[in-house]
Design a protein with these regions (language model features):
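Short alpha-helical segments used as structural interaction elements across diverse proteins
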Residues: 6-8, 12-13, 51, 124
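Mature catalytic domains of secreted/periplasmic carbohydrate-active enzymes
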Residues: 30-465
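N-terminal export signals
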Residues: 12-30
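N-terminal secretory signal peptides
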Residues: 1-8, 20
Length: 465
């Protein structure tokens, strides 16, 4: 869902071919509770709410009329971004909203399963790039007010989060590909051309190469869009009580204009002072991003330990929103990614797209059930923990809590872990079984071995203290 240039190119190539280190000692390592993001020469620091780095895992819920058409978000609108059977002209796409009727919508059922699986926070899609609002907004002309009799899909979700005990988070795209204020030549200007081919800003020159309009006229367009965005923010951030997280997506607007990014961020923090914001409210022409933490790792793994507070987001079923009964990665994969991210001080945002009728696929509950079994014995190793010295002083990922090191055996073939710079332990045990694990000193190193009686399971964790 991230609309950055490199991701766009990589994703396009893939889809055409097939388908958005820290120094020791440990006390000085993560968790660093300052956001750190560098673009060009600008670094943005801001204190983040302490719950977020401790939380570890979030549930992303992208949903909307696109789910009816079994297409990913609004990307089917672009004829050059999808194969012919996945391309939806504007009129056909907008007609999906008349068929979007989640009569079996029961968010509490989703969230109970998610809570048991270890998820701590959420990001419910309020509006994606197609501009469809999931609540009866007074701003804009595409949403439940026009197509669902004014039904509010947001309030039941918020109330269910609070009953279940999950942090309330929203995902919102200020970009609106279908925004069509009176007097403009076509919908979606200037992020597309009249044939709805995807175009992007030429940031390096500060000029919008995709629009044959002067900057003042373009500025007028964005001022009108800003009024809609601000109005919608005023609704969702005052109607539903305390909101813990706002996950921006797609604020990728052209250079050379004021797209109100800083004003938007300031306005949100005025309405919700304790809210956590990601870094996708972008100010490309000013050489920096805003927000509290980095979301640089979308559907890809970091090659080295990222700096500061960060989150990886991933569509484990192949696409963000519902695209039919596509295969999903197994629970063991989700647990492994969570463990690796936590060992480097990051969070993991996992995406599952609900069906258009409001139900979740059975595979969602299967994955959550398997994760819940693992969480019952090993959840302490991934929540409210610090990053460990991996790979500097351990050959397996390590998380730390107090005086305990949690060793994550992620490969079924690895039966021993080697640690350096650690005192001889007083206790070494397998979390899943409670059995003692053997250890020995070897040339100033400590080698911890899994008991032979312990079969290889997903992320076998050994606690060393």
């Amino acid at each position: 869902m991230r609309d950055n240039e490199s991701l766009f190119r990589r994703r396009t190539l893939l889809k055409r071919a097939a388908m958005a280190g820290l120094s020791l000692p440990l006390a000085a390592q993560q968790q660093d509770t300052e956001a750190f993001r560098r673009i060009g020469e600008t670094v943005v620091h801001r204190k983040i709410q302490p719950w977020f780095p401790k939380a570890g895992m979030g549930l992303f819920l992208p949903w909307g009329p696109c789910s009816v058409g079994e297409i990913e978000g609004g990307w089917g609108l672009f004829r050059d971004m999808r194969p012919p059977n996945k391309y939806w002209p504007i009129e056909k796409y907008m007609a999906l909203a008349d068929r979007f009727n989640p009569q079996n919508y029961d968010p509490e059922k989703w969230l109970v399963a998610a809570k048991q699986a270890g998820f701590k926070y959420t990001a419910f899609l309020l509006r994606h790039h197609d501009g469809y609002a999931m609540w009866p907004t007074e701003y804009g002309e595409f949403g439940t007010k026009q197509h669902m009799g004014g039904r509010d899909l947001v309030r039941p979700f918020v109330e269910a989060c609070r009953r279940v005990g999950l942090k309330v988070g929203f995902c919102y795209s200020p970009t609106d590909w279908l925004f069509n204020p009176k007097g403009w030549p076509w919908r979606g200007f200037p992020l597309r051309d009249p044939e709805f081919k995807y175009r992007r800003p030429e940031r390096s020159r500060g000029l919008p190469r995709y629009a044959d309009m002067p900057i003042p006229q373009m500025q007028k367009y964005f001022d009108q869009l800003w009024a809609v965005v601000k109005g919608q923010m005023s609704e969702v951030l005052t109607r539903y009580g305390k909101i813990d997280l706002l996950w921006w997506d797609g604020y990728d607007w052209p250079a050379g204009i004021d797209h109100h990014g800083q004003e938007l961020e300031d306005y949100v923090r005025k309405l919700q002072p304790d809210i956590v914001l990601n870094d996708r409210n972008m100010l490309w022409d000013k050489g920096r991003t805003l927000g509290d933490y980095s979301t640089a790792f979308e559907n890809r793994n970091p090659a080295e330990r990222p700096k500061g507070v960060w989150e990886q987001c991933e569509a484990v079923c192949g696409t963000w929103s519902y695209e039919g009964e596509s295969p999903c990665k197994p629970a063991s994969y989700v647990i492994e990614r969570l463990a690796r991210n936590r060992a480097w001080g990051g969070n993991y945002m996992v995406s599952f797209g609900p069906r258009p009728d409001g139900t979740m696929r059975p595979v969602f509950y299967e994955i959550c059930s398997q994760m819940a079994r693992w969480m019952r014995h090993s959840g302490e190793s991934v929540f409210d923990v610090e990053a460990g010295p991996y790979p500097e002083r351990s050959d397996v990922p390590v998380t730390i809590k107090g005086g305990t090191w949690y060793l994550h055996f992620l490969s079924p073939t690895q039966r021993a872990a080697t640690l350096t710079g650690i005192k001889p332990p007083s206790s070494v045990r397998v979390l899943r079984t409670g059995q003692a694990a053997s250890w020995k000193e070897d040339g100033g190193r400590v080698v911890v071995s899994l008991p032979e009686s312990v079969p290889a399971k997903m992320d076998e964790v050994v606690a060393v203290s």
